[in-house]
Amino acid sequence: MRGFLKTFFASLLALIIFTVLGVFIIIGIGVSAASSTKDVAIGDKAVLVLDLSVPFAEQHVENPFGALSGDADDIPSLHEAVKLIEHAATDSKVSGIYIKMNMNTNGYAATEELRTALLKFRKSKKFVIAYGETVFQTAYYLASAAEHVYVQPKGLFEWGGLSVEYTFYKGLLDKLEIEPQIFYAGKFKSFTEPFRATAMTDANKLQTMVWLGDLYNQMLAKIADGRKLDTSQLRLLANTGAIQTPAD
């Protein structure tokens, strides 16, 4: 019994010590991150870089371990990114915007907000250019708001329309003998469909084609307007898969 108590209290003491050390380490990281924050001086003829590989979330995202890794940069929220573009339009030290348009990690809604902000920025008569090596469709859609778009000659250019894919779990659930309790009303209520069907129902196919087609039509119209092209020409290029490389 005495040996058990000795081991127990020794383990408890070790746990307390490690907990206290952990708290001090976290506090130290916070203090270090706070002390590393400083104002950045912007020189004349500065260029605002919009990197589409950065996901602009709805809320501001901070890296709590940035002080340890040496990378204390924070990712601005979507609202902050839009405000930065708006501020750059009136900042005399900012000459223009450079868009890195390889892979756009932002959703359609965020992409639309950024694109709208860029179109407003262009009214300031400052330049907006975009460049990419492997350019995907949603990235080009945003970049179509730029004055000039450049693609690496040996790179890749994707242009093939829009599509959606759904994963169905009913077959797996049946094999595991799991019966989910699902409640829905109406044939167009498709949120629970992956758990009660093995393929898309006709109703879901119809509604998906409607909203996806509407989204695609809007995208084509805005790209055509920005690049001075015809929507029927863009649709034909996508349907035939005629564009695979920048040379195409």
Q: Where are the regions a protein language model picked out?
A:
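Long, low-complexity segments enriched in small/aliphatic residues
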Residues: 247-248
